[in-house]
Structure formats: C-alpha cells, structure tokens
C-alpha cells in the first residue's frame, strides 16, 4: 500500500511539471524593457493582460510594488518610486509571474542620480507649479525627465536649473536663447515675480523720456553723448530734443570717457540742464561741424512708452511715389487700434510703398503681429495662413497645434476682433521694406517670415536679425501674496510654406552696420537705413554699397566708446507671446 501511494504521489508531481505552459502568460504590456523614471519619483501605472492569476515583486525598496497580485484578465501594475536623493543613478528589476506559466517577465526601472536639497524650501510650492507647467508645455519637455530637481531652491535658481539641465543634454534646447558664436548669452524662457525686471510698451516710467543714448567721439575734436531715440510725448520731446542731437555737457560738466556713465544716467533720469548741439558734415561727410542749440532744461515726469513712435508719409522726389514710414517699437494689443489708425492715415494719403522700421522692436504679442500682417497684406490674402505654431512632441502627438490667419479673428488663443477689422484698413501691398538689426526679434521676425510665406516681397536693410523662431505661452499664478509670471518657450513659428529655420536670423538684402554712422532723424534721407530704403523705392533697384559700408559707414563716422544700452529705462520684454492665462 505504501509503495502504491509513493508511486501515485510521484505521478502527480511529474504531471504538474508537465502541465506548465510555455511562455509567460502576459500580453499587451505597457512597460518597456527599460523604463526611465524622474528623479523626484512618483507613481508608475502599467497595464497588461494576464492569462491567469499573477504576482509581482521588486528588487529594490525604493521602487515599491503597490499591486502585488491580481487575477486573470485586464490588469494594472502600480509602482511607487521614491525620490532619489543620492549622488548616483539606480535601477530596480520588476518581476511578474503568471500561475501555470513557465517563464516570469522582468523589466527594469531606472532613475537618474539625485541630489541633496540645498535650499530652505520657502518656494517649494512655486517650484512644483513651475516644474509641472514646464513638463507639460516646454518645447523640449521630455528632456526634463533627466534633470535632477531640487524643489528647495529659490524659484529663480530652480527655474535656471531646469533650463541648464536640459541644455546639458547636448543643447537640445539650443533655440531657447540668443547665441554669440558658441556662447549662449541668455535664455528666452523667463520666470518673473512681482519685482519688475522688465516692462512692455504702455507701462509707466519716470524720467526724461529718452529711449537710447550713445557715448561717442566725432573726429578728433568732439566727445559727447548722442541722442539716438526720443519717446514721443515726454519731457525730452517737449524740450525739442531729436535723434542726432549731440550733448557735450550735463549741468555744466563736460562729457568725458570717465564720466559718461554717470552723466548718461542723469540724462535718462531728467531734471538736468544739458548743452545741446546739432551736427552737420562737410568735406563729403568726413568733417563734423557742431552748431550750438543752447542749454536745454530737461525735465523729469511719468511717461509711457507707446508701440508707435512715429508714422509719417514721405513723398519721393522726382517720382509719383509716396512711402509710409512706421517706427514700430513693440507689438502690444493695447496699441492695435493706434496701429490701425496709422494705416488709415497712410491710405488717406495714397501711399504706394511702406517702410517698416523694426530696428528696436524685439517682439511682443502674436495677436498684434497678425494685425500688422493683415494691415500689410489685405483682402487678397484673407483666410491664408500667416503663422502656424508647432508644440512639443507630446502635444503634437495629441493633435494640438495653433494657426493665425490673415483677416481671421478666430485664433488658437482667442477670438480677436482687430484682426478681422484690420482688413478694412489694409494697404494690400505686394512688397515692403523693413529696417532691421540684431534687436529685431520674435514677433518682428514673425512678420518677415509670415509675409514671405504669402509670397509678399520683404526687402530687408540693416544687420542680421536676432533669430528667434520660437514663442511662448504665458501663465500667471499667485503664491505668498505675489504674482509669478512664467513664460517658457513652447512653440515653433512656421509660415504658410512650413519654413521656420531662421534661428540664425534673417540676412538683409542690403547689409550695413549703421552703428558707426552718425544718426539722422527717422524717416528722412539723413537716416542711413531710411535713405537706402527711399532710394530703393525711387529707383526700383536694390542699392549697391561700397564694400567698406557693408560693415561700417565710410562717412558721417562716429566712434562709440561707451555703452549706455543697459542703462536705458525702457527695456521691453519682447518675444513672440500669447496672452498669459491666470491660474487659480
């Protein structure tokens, strides 16, 4: 009897082994052989189909299996991954076994090296919000998964750590920023608190109302500060200062190479007495002649910087042509009605051509750029694509994109009536002339690219543009009784032909650096770039410059020795931005 029982027992055991099925009994698994998890950890959910009851286990405590078993059918494997605070990367092996099947399934969860917290944690909630938005909206969002994030840092350092961490991955976010050679000078993406780091057109300032000064030498005899741009409606404008005025003394103190910074700042601030001269040139533009305009009391007062500094009509001598000239300083929806009114004035005087001066325009609202594009193109282009926005891979795969069309008020971000209304005030041009510089960026370059996509001829005069072919969606949220404004680069800007490869800037048709040429009044033959545009319009032929003038002027020469660019009170935000959304 005992022998029989042993034989039967052995038979049952051998039968169980023979009944194990080949394979693993798992289908449609959502995991990969290797799965990267973010440094700060989180929960991973993987779906799969099991042919029988199953169990799962992890080789590491930091990667906890929360659903350790389940029944046959559609199943969910949930893993809870801890934040990595260690200075080395780590991995865990997850094994899933299905009852009745011979082979378990294993896969690996990897986590990059972490870091210990370095801050006081005061802005942790701000940083968590920033990280969430960046992971969703940033144009190179997938690279953030590989960046160790220390949420304890101050918000500005935390934001920089994200951008720098993505850049460390072979500069995948190269187009987020302005470069000089192989050096990134700054990022376009920005995070600001209530502290006013920069301002947009229309915001209030206090001072004289001079937009830009330049410390320079004229010939061998004169040294001073030249007025480059005056803001309309300000104390400087009311005092009669114009572009090209030469200041040789401030409050009786003569300008020198050692005091130009302090005197220049005093002129920006106002409430000073300045000695002003006009400058003319003899000997074929090689010898400067100063004519005193006297001492001018330069006041100081609150002022705003409008989007339009000048619009005028220039009659072209010895022709029947008229050119509209527009000195446009920033794309701002608050000034779109004034922009439309300026084009009405152009239409009323029957202009045949347009000179668009974007030398100092570093961008602004995408909606305003579309209004300007419509005012130039007109009814013949109604409904045609002006700009197409391409978002990050995740949003693109989800079918998300954004379009802006000539004369169509329905846009990706909102319904904006001025775009449609602009059709009734448009010039309907097939060709325009644009004055450009390295400052010309974003929404300004969007005009150039958008019109060229419609086969409108855009002739550029000046220096290569900034090369900002990306834009930003903004979001505002309040923390600790402060507003935080986040503008990450979140889309590429393409035209109707799908072209977006202008990160190195647009090269001018007539390239000339006018920074060493003494400035003349805007919209006149005394302004070097304006002169070239007017000559081009008059002759219908592109101006041919002596080779020396492609880089530096050969007449009316000035030698700048001091940079007063960073001192200027008006420093527009720029960009190609969608209107920010407030989150609660």
Feature locations, PLM:
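Flexible, low-complexity junctional segments that flank or bridge functional domains
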Residues: 115-354, 368, 378, 552-584
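Surface-exposed loop/turn motifs at beta-strand-loop junctions within extracellular Ig-like
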Residues: 83, 98-100, 278-280
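Bacterial Sec-dependent N-terminal signal peptides
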Residues: 6-34, 99-124
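Surface-exposed binding patches on compact interaction domains or structured appendages
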Residues: 49-78
